[in-house]
Amino acid sequence: MDYRKNLNYFKSSDKWYYIGLPIAVIGCGFFVCTLFYWYFIPYQMPIGIILAAVGAGIAFLPYSKCAKEAEIDEAVCAASENYSQEVSSKLSFEKELLKNTEPLTAHGYIYSDDVLMRRGRVDRVCRTSGYSVAKIFCTKYGLVVFDKSFSLTREAEHENMDSYPFAQLDFVSVVDEQFVCKDQSKIKVSYFVIQKDGTDILRLPVKHDVAVDKLCSTVNEMIGKMKNT
């Protein structure tokens, strides 16, 4: 992972793109008009070439020092898959896993005031410099959660493993929230939440889909059974 290029991406701005692009378009316009012998100003051809080159440089040169959005997406996807495989390869409690319940990989960008944030120019996805990935296993007695958070702009990561006995939990759920950015725009975010004694003891970024809803249903059913025994 190229931390410097990632840092440049999160600190970059689209303003140079929107300044340079019109200049390049005007330059190309002069160049094309000259080809059809339409002249509006003296030295139209060389001026058009210069404007096109300068505009393109202003618009696109800053991006050459930044990571592309696709590269960041590939990096977090690879990190998620690698961590998931790493955790699965060193399991020591396979016999205790609940049958017919697949482990869940929960992952997503970390949205907080402590991270750098940038909205994609094309896809408008709001990416941040922090990412979280977790592997959640459902055993006969409780949840076992391996989680890792890491930075995309510097060498920093944190790993943790905890077990959560069903009998001690209130419930688990997926919570959909809105995070308000510094520019006052809002982002929909989802968290896998474990609650104990009326308090959220774990919140993990997750994609809200059928798999996580199914896991929550299974876990809450197990919590109910344990509390009634």
Residue positions per predicted region:
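Phosphoinositide-binding peripheral membrane targeting modules
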Residues: 127-133, 139-185
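Anionic N-terminal interaction surfaces
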Residues: 2-11, 65-136
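Canonical phosphoinositide-binding patch of PH/PH-like domains
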Residues: 193-214
